[in-house]
From Swiss-Prot:
It comes from Marinobacter nauticus (strain ATCC 49840 / DSM 8798 / CIP 103578 / SP17) (Marinobacter hydrocarbonoclasticus). This is Alkane uptake protein A. The gene is aupA. Transmembrane segments: none annotated. Belongs to the OmpP1/FadL family. It is a multi-pass membrane protein. Interacts with the inner membrane protein AupB.
Length: 452
């Protein structure tokens, strides 16, 4: 068996030499530590504090800019424009009691995001006067210093399938009211497909010359569709009925992932003559499955309660891995290939308005692990079922002398308990070790919102 890994982190101050070393590391098949994973900010934790605090149970009805990811149609719920800035910090301790490892902590690197989003009504650009809302949300890792966190590697001691640093999170979308309480929206999730080409002549000591490097990152647009129905406005717009206060929503998100392709050609003097050694690596990270979700909520006088059921089609990841040079499942016997299940995630949450200035909210969710196989040679992925609980508070400051609308502050906290699960870890020599994986994750989020 062989060890393969690729690791790439691009920041606003990256240098060509740093990228060269990263590509050269791939070319030399060196192992470097991983910090990224499958999933993304929106589904692993929650985009804004409201999403974090409610365990995403009310996210399909959230009028803030995070609606561009969860349900673009919800952008129509508030006609005012919005400018939001926030931060998210996730502390994680992912464990595996491997007797052959130096400790039981597999990963404890935090995920730290700075977020900014905006929503506005473009209806005034037309002569029709019909509202058309446009919104976007962007999140950058390491508090704005890391534009792309990407890694892919094999492991002989175990690595977690999800969690870790997240790549650039960017969503852009729009929505419009259609008819009597029915709104529709669409957005795109922007991911990056990076390619790197390196040609060089090297000595056995690693000194290179005649280097030629080309790096390119192209955006890939993945569709998100959503609709929101206010049942009272739709079925009894001019009178009271039992449907007043009820809303339902439906969303669809196509699968997405970040990908990197590296092509290199190295001539090693006195060892590998021209045309040299050609190496090609294609791999993915931050895979997010095709997702279908339906939700409903009931709003009373100063309170609301709601929930959603979300189907995530993780089985598609098996096909993605079959063409991945690092995961390399295409060359593995069918009985030993990694397997994934499609999963259903139930979510439930509530919000209560204490007074005109303060509101509290909470939510709970239970997520089964999509990882079906517990023995995955070379990859040795670990993943467990998890219980998610969140709490949050909002404060509205309305004594603003210069601003036209009140300022809103949101805080959210989320705890994720990863349940114990047994795995068989296989090292590169084929020796097997039984391990138990579990973990704890704490997420803190805050934001400030201005209306206009």
């Amino acid at each position: 068996m062989s060890e393969r890994s690729v690791y790439m982190v691009l920041s606003p101050r990256f240098s060509v030499r740093a990228v060269s070393l990263a590509v050269a590391a791939v070319s030399a098949s060196l192992s470097m530590p991983t910090s990224a994973s499958m999933g993304n900010l929106g589904t692993s934790y929650g985009v804004m504090p409201v999403d974090v605090a409610t365990a995403q149970s009310l996210s399909m009805f959230n009028e803030q800019v995070s609606a561009t990811y969860y349900n673009p149609a919800a952008l129509t719920k508030d006609p005012r424009g919005e400018l939001t800035a926030g931060i998210l910090h996730s502390e994680q301790e992912l464990r595996s009691d491997n007797p052959n490892a130096s400790g039981d902590i597999v990963s404890d690197s935090p995920s730290q995001h700075v977020l900014i989003g905006m929503k506005t009504n473009l209806g005034s650009l037309t002569r029709f006067g019909h509202p058309i809302y446009l919104g976007f949300i962007a999140g950058v890792e390491k508090y704005g210093k890391e534009m792309l966190a990407f890694s892919s590697e094999t492991s002989e001691s175990g690595q977690f399938l999800q969690y870790g640093k997240e790549p650039l999170f960017l969503n852009i979308g729009g929505a419009t009211p259609i008819w009597r309480g029915i709104s529709a929206g669409a957005s795109v999730r922007v991911t990056l497909e990076a390619t790197a080409n390196l040609d060089a002549v090297s000595t056995l000591g690693g000194e290179t010359s005649r280097e030629r490097l080309a790096v390119n990152a192209e955006p890939s647009l993945k569709t998100i569709l959503g609709t929101n129905i206010d049942l009272g406005s739709t079925f009894c717009p001019e009178s009271d009925c039992f449907l007043n206060g009820w809303e339902t929503a439906l969303t669809y998100r196509t699968k997405s992932s970040a990908s990197t392709t590296v092509d290199s050609n190295i001539i090693v003097t006195q060892t590998i003559p021209d045309p040299g050694l050609s190496l090609a690596v294609t791999t993915i990270d931050s895979f997010q499955p095709e997702t279908i979700a339906i939700g409903t909520q009931y709003s009373g006088d100063g309170w609301r309660i709601g929930g959603s059921i979300e189907q995530q089609n993780w089985s598609e990841l098996e096909d993605e891995f079959s063409g991945d040079s690092i995961k390399d499942q295409g060359s593995v016997a069918s009985g030993n290939r990694i397997g994934f299940d499609d999963i259903l995630i139930p979510r439930l949450g509530a919000e209560y308005q204490l007074n005109k200035n303060f509101a509290v909210r909470g939510g709970v969710a239970y997520e089964e692990s999509p990882l079906k196989t517990t023995r995955n040679p070379e990859l040795n992925y670990l993943d467990t079922d998890k219980l998610v609980v969140g709490l949050g508070i909002s404060a509205t400051y309305d004594r603003t002398r210069l601003l036209a609308y009140p300022v809103r502050l949101d805080l959210g906290y989320q705890y994720q308990q990863l349940q114990e699960r047994d795995f068989t870890v296989v090292d590169y020599d084929g020796d097997e070790t039984s391990v138990t994986a579990d973990g704890d994750i704490h997420v803190f989020s805050g934001s400030i919102t201005l209306k206009f």
